[in-house]
Amino acid sequence: PPQSMGLVMEVHEVQLTEQDHIEYRMLGDLPYIIIEREGCKRLFLSGVTGDVLHQSIREQSHEVFSRIAKVLETEGMPVSSIIRQWNYIEKITACDATGHQHYQDFNDARSLFYNGVEWTTGYPAATGIGTQWGGIMIDVDALLCKDGSVRVLGVDNPLQIAAHAYSQNVLLGEKDVALPQKTTPKFERAKAVWKEDHGFVYVSGTAAIRGEQSLEGVGIEQQTLTTLENIEYLVSHDNLNRSGIPATENATLITFRVYVKRWEDMEKARQVVTERYPDLPAIYTLTDVCRSELLIEIEGIGVLC
């Protein structure tokens, strides 16, 4: 529940079959989990940080992505096998003395990491969220199925411009010197995993954005409602089918993670969410989001059938 301080935990369950084999592995000081069966491998890697927290956000981002790349290479999994990514960015909307915004520096580093990769099923689902300290930290869920038994598809939302297609108008700060211009946030609005007649969908961090513009000046209740409407349309039966997922109904949302910028808005946001989803497990955290005018961001997981 919302509290002024303390620890909150979210637990994800993975159902294993008789064919699945699970291993806990290490690469240097990085622990990770592999679930594998013939023709299919899944990787869970979390808490990847840089070695030097006083380095710039740009330097830390490049280092963290380099460490992730080494794990993927060790496991024989391409960068494009990443289906979900959680990106925790210290003081996400802050700018340094040279005019570089933390979030933009991270996005430029991510673009360079993704460069040259064939994203045939779309970019990963992702959340980019602020922290008070800690530099850059990334969690990754990757899936590689060579036997064709599982389909992985990016899901777009017609209510919003794809984040990776944003114009320069909504990108702040200075660009990376290695790039011709500032680069966009490389993620899909959702990522679906489908097998035979069922699956699940990772809903990316979603906010009160229509097109590429934030909904400003309306207060936390309206931003929360608009965010939920964006998610509901995203995982609707019609939109899933439009994205190539043969779901027969809307995705059933099974969990939310709610990021609220201001403590005084926490209870108001909770009331809007619980009124619409009274039985849905949700955790609430006090944290900054990727635009200064946005007051809330919500991510989730849904079940497909």
List where the protein language model places each region.
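N-terminal presequence-like segments and the immediate start of the first folded domain
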Residues: 1-86, 91-305
